[in-house]
Amino acid sequence: KGLNQSVALAKSGIDTWHAGNIGEDGEFLAEILQKAGAHTDFISRLPGRNGHAIIQKQPNGQNCILLYGGSNRQNTRTQVDEVLSHFEKGDYLILQNEINEIAYIMERAHEKGMIIVLNPSPMDEKIFTYPLEYVDYFLLNEIEAKDLTGFDVCTEKEGIETDALLDAVCSHFPNSKVVLTLGEYGSIY
């Protein structure tokens, strides 16, 4: 997910730096980023296998993610501090939940005044240990929104308004902006 986000941003013409780790089998990923125009200065090459995800998409547009952490879960606080030292107030930091040290990354980015965007996928219980009050933008699907808020309703395509789910997220995180993705039905903000 992180690589896809960086590729999309770079292809859109946004100056993009991708930070993280790749394993011995991941050099092709750095090449994909470079070809898209993303900067890869902050990618570390580590021994072992690359992290990866398998995304299973259902006909209704929903997905299920199977994750192997690999090198993605080997970030160090020293590495985080080094990368963030190159950024400043007002710079965007886009995070997804496939890596480790997210709470630390968010704390340091918040101290610098960076704008934090969080896609909590793949959702797990650790998300509730993160300083979510520091998130400026959430990128959520319906299931993640329900999990974050405890809001237990169906969505519009199943008979109940999606606006109520978006309102629940906004109520839980009043200082954050929210993009709620709705599978084949698009998204709302």
Segment roles from a protein language model:
Residues 111-115, 121-189:
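Conserved phosphate/ATP/ADP-binding segment of small-molecule kinases
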Residues 88, 103-116:
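Glycosyltransferases and closely related glycan-assembly transferases
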Residues 18, 43-45, 55-92:
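Conserved phosphate-binding/catalytic loop of the ribokinase/pfkB sugar-kinase fold
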Residues 82-83, 101-104, 125-128, 165:
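Short acidic active-site motifs
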Residues 1-52:
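Substrate-binding N-lobe of the ribokinase-like
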Residues 37, 73-78, 117-123:
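Short gly/ser/thr-rich secondary-structure transition/capping motifs
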Residues 21-24, 59, 68, 119-121:
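Cofactor-binding loop segments of dinucleotide-utilizing enzymes, especially the Rossmann-like FAD-
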